[in-house]
Amino acid sequence: METFKEYVTKRIDNTIPQVKEMFKLIWLGVADSMKLKGAIIRTIKSEVLRKNFIHCIFLNGIIFLGTYLIYLYWVSPMLNYLLNHFPTLSNMFTIIYFSLWVYPVYIFSIIANSKWYTEIAKESFVISGRTTFANSTNGILSSFVDEIYRNLLFGVILVMSAIIAFIPYTNFINFVIITWLYSFWCFDYKWILRGKWNLLQRIQYFETHWAYMFGYGLIFTTCSFFFPMLIGNAIFSILYPLFIILSISAKPTKMVNQDGILPKQIPIFYVPEIIVNVILKLYVKYKNTRGAAKSTTPSPSPTTKQN
């Protein structure tokens, strides 16, 4: 029977080939995400893909990003020069410009992009020779619940990322989190269209393929992460359709060597899941308390009309 020391030594020795396999899987993910030529060719050949991708470029690249860059590098410096002695007026113009143009366009782009991304994913799925799963009534209800939980989960992750960004020397941690999140967003369309897995199953699959998934999202995140928020989001919105298209034909690989100290599965979404579950429990408790309070409130007695 091996001692604890022998067990630890064996695990450490087996970690070296495991690390090599990890970097190999990361590179496979990077390589699959760099096949942009194939995604562009598919986009050009398909009318649906081409139309929706042009919409994404026009809205995000020209209307939103273009006008924002014009303001940032032309209008704003000119205003600062002209209103050098009236900084209050310059600040007022900035507030008005962002309130009436930048943020409304940004919100509209989020809504429009969601529709276009879905169309792009569906068409890519069909082009790849796959067929979508026909949902039953129970399946539709389950998908609706999944979608609510999914949006809450992503919202919590983004809030956590924003909080981490304010902590010194955590930029790398934030980059890793966003890389995994972007990668999940790319593949989630494919998994939803298959219709075979619920959200928790999709998360489990993602977490057991953590090395490949990190590699797949690495280039995508690098292209937008280091820019200011609005510019980075615009770049993300332009590139995202291409990475969705590539994810449809990608074949993620998980780590085979389990004898080292590297984990088989990294619980990437563990903390956000706990927070979402707490939020949902508090909401249900609040609704139940409110419903009980309403049921115990006496109804007003009817008044009698006197002649």
Swiss-Prot record:
Keywords: Glycoprotein, Membrane, Transmembrane, Transmembrane helix
A Pfam family that the UniProt record links to this protein: EI24
TM ranges: 53-73, 92-112, 153-173, 175-195, 225-245, 260-280
Entry membrane topology: Multi-pass membrane protein
Signal peptide residue numbers: none
Location in the cell: Membrane
Glycosylation sites: N135
Entries under PANTHER family matching the protein: ETOPOSIDE-INDUCED PROTEIN 2.4 HOMOLOG, P53 INDUCED PROTEIN
Family that this chain belongs to: Belongs to the EI24 family.
Name this protein carries in UniProt: Protein EI24 homolog
